Amino acid sequence: MLKLIIYLRPAARYFLIAWLLTIIIVSSIPNIPTLKIHTAGKEIRLDYLMHFCEYGVLTFMAFLSIVGKEFKIHFRKVLLIAAGLIMFAILDELHQKLIPGRSYNIKDMMSNVTGIMVVTVFTVVLFRMIKDKIVQEK
C-alpha cells in the first residue's frame, strides 16, 4: 500500500483536478434522487456516507499532490489545505441552492467537513509513517 502511494504521488495533481471537476459536475446535476436503504421500519440515507467518502478522497488527493518526495508536510500547510477544502465544501453546498431540485443541506455539509477532518488526520499519520520508512531505507 505504501509503495502504491509513493508511486501515485507524481500524478496526484491530475487526480485532484479530475476529482474536483467530478464533484462540481455531479453537484450541478439537477434532481438527483437520494439513495436510501429501507430496513424494518427505518430508512438509512446513503448520501451522507457518499459525501464523507467524496471529500475524504478529495482531501487525500490534495495532500498527496502537495507533498514532496520525502513526504514531509508542515503543520501550517495542513491547516491551510484543510481550511481551503472546508471552504470548497461550503461553497459546493451553497451553489446547490441555485440548481433546480437541489438544496443546501447542513447534514451534507457536516458529512463533507467530517470526511475532510478524518482523512486529514489519517493522511498526516500515514505520511509520517512513509517518511519514517524512507529515512530507515537510506
Where are these regions (language model features)?
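Membrane-helix interface segments
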Residues: P10-Y14, F71-L80, N105-I106
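Membrane-interfacial alpha-helical segments at the cytosolic side of multi-pass membrane proteins
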Residues: C53-K69, T114-I130
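Small-polar-interrupted transmembrane alpha-helices in polytopic inner-membrane proteins
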Residues: A18-S27, K77-K97
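Juxtamembrane helix-capping/reentrant segments at transmembrane boundaries
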Residues: G41-L46, H74-F75, K107, S111
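"…centered on the first transmembrane helix and the immediately adjacent amphipathic helix/loop
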Residues: M1-S65, I81
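Short, charged juxtamembrane terminal tails flanking transmembrane helices
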Residues: K3, K133-K138
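Interfacial helix-loop-helix junctions of multi-pass membrane proteins
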Residues: P33, I37-H38, I90-V113
